[in-house]
Amino acid sequence: MPIRHCIVHLIDKKPDGSPAVLHARDSELAASDAIENLLADLNDSYNAKQGKAWGFFHGESGAYPLSGWLKQYLEGEKDFTAFSRVAVEHLQKLMEESNLSTGGHILFAHYQQGMTEYLAIALLHHSEGVAVNAELDVTPSRHLDLGQLHLAARINLSEWKNNQNSKQYISFIKGKNGKKVSDYFRDFIGCQEGVDGPGETRTLLKAFSDFVESEDLPEESAREKTQTLVEYATTQTKLGEPVTLEELSSLIDEDRPKAFYDHIRNKDYGLSPEIPADKRTLNQFRRFTGRAEGLSISFEAHLLGDKVEYDEAAGTLIIKGLPTTLVDQLKRRKD
């Protein structure tokens, strides 16, 4: 993963309405194994995050200036350090307006994966831990906690430059606690949502279910194709890449590689050629789950019609091949 440029700044702020103090770095970080490892770990953590949203830049304005500064950098009017400096100063102002925001280290990284260039911007925090030193003493230790990555965005620079009509060249982590916590970061990026990842994924799965039904496939074949879809889509989410409908179609049916793709187009599901799959929605498709008072049921989707039978009229499930541990518990209760 070639890293073109990388820099870190610090915004010191507590979530109590106090002023945000900027500690800006004057030069880029020199290339090192540590930087490469940090970016690799950040990518892995970001790709694994659920609840991301996809979108595109607002028109450049005083409220959303980042895209203009980024364009100046890419066209050589600003160097990377100058771009990151004006950007982090803007973020500092937005943080001060958001009382509940917390400061941290702001990472800017321009890097390349394959033929695609990206800009990653992330707010990083430290965690306190312990370590054993060379004298075998236990000492306090601080490290960047990438597992607690709550505010980050990734801009596909290649897509932005080469596809003016794209509405999904920016991805960002969507906060769970609403506007007060995370919207200031989205406003900093200047991003408006263009693609509903969970909604697009649900539509894709609906199209697939309709396709399987229309093909009247044997149960084993339907199960294999379902597994192929879920595995491919899950792999793409781990890589931070979209699901490509034509590629998915060729994987689902190697003998008729366009069959599923043509089904989607002919039925007009409204899906884009590439969609950002939502991991949580995929997991729901992989398993059926349900809870009621004192009862929890979960089983893999492909077991329906085999080991699990559903009677809609009676509202019952018949489960065959019970787990041995469950059978033993039931026997002990009976005795």
From Swiss-Prot:
Quick one: where is this thing mainly located?
A: cytoplasm
Residue ranges annotated as transmembrane are: none
In its UniProt record, a GO molecular function of this protein is: single-stranded RNA binding
Give compartment(s).
Cytoplasm, Nucleoid
Asked whether the keyword Cytoplasm is assigned, the reply is yes
Keywords in alphabetical order: Cytoplasm
Q: PANTHER family, from UniProt?
A: NUCLEOID-ASSOCIATED PROTEIN YEJK, PTHR38772
In terms of HAMAP family, this protein maps to: NdpA
NCBIfam families linked: PRK00378.1
**Family of the protein in this entry:** Belongs to the YejK family.
What is the name listed in the Swiss-Prot or TrEMBL entry for this protein? Nucleoid-associated protein Pput_1012
